């Protein structure tokens, strides 16, 4: 049997950062599944969300907890359901984002993927001005547009699929 998406995400991140620095935030009911799939991680690497309230509150709560552990941490938020087919390109993009965050400590970097088709089930990031190599300001976010707008976004060349991955520094 193959690796689950959670295990693949963990493996991918463990090639980028020390494994003991990977923190998994999950709803309380799923903690046992996380422990079953990743038996080698310690309990303090799992943040069990007390209330299921979607992504933003979960990320805010996890960021608060991580900041308490290390005020100078760089935080990478990533869903565990990503389908990453080019690991080398992913690692290069992560390193580029981390380098940018090191220079611009107040920045938040959202990772997007160039769309290959109109997909109304995905969120979109509209690219703004170029600020560093392959890093742009964000002009707009659009959450799950209808197919017509998704097609316009793809045709414009200004939009990326929102991966849900982003980087930020812990509050200093």
Segments the model singles out, each with a brief description of its role:
Residues 1-79, 85-91, 95:
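Conserved N-terminal catalytic core of the sugar/cofactor nucleotidyltransferase
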């Amino acid at each position: 049997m193959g690796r689950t998406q959670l295990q693949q995400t963990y493996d991918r991140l463990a090639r980028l950062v020390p494994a003991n620095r990977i923190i998994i935030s999950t709803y309380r009911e799923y903690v046992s599944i996380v422990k079953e799939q990743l038996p080698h991680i310690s309990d303090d690497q799992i943040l069990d969300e007390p209330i299921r309230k979607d992504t933003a509150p979960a990320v805010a709560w996890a960021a608060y907890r991580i900041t308490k552990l290390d005020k100078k941490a760089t935080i990478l938020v990533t869903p565990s359901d990503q389908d990453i087919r080019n690991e080398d390109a992913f690692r290069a993009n992560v390193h580029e984002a981390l380098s940018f965050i090191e220079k611009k400590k107040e920045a938040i970097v959202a990772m997007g993927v160039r769309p290959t088709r109109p997909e109304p089930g995905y969120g979109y990031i509209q690219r703004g001005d170029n600020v560093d190599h392959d890093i742009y300001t964000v002009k707009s976010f659009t959450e799950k547009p209808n197919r017509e707008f998704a097609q316009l976004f793809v045709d414009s060349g200004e939009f990326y699929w929102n991966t849900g991955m982003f980087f930020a520094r812990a509050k200093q």
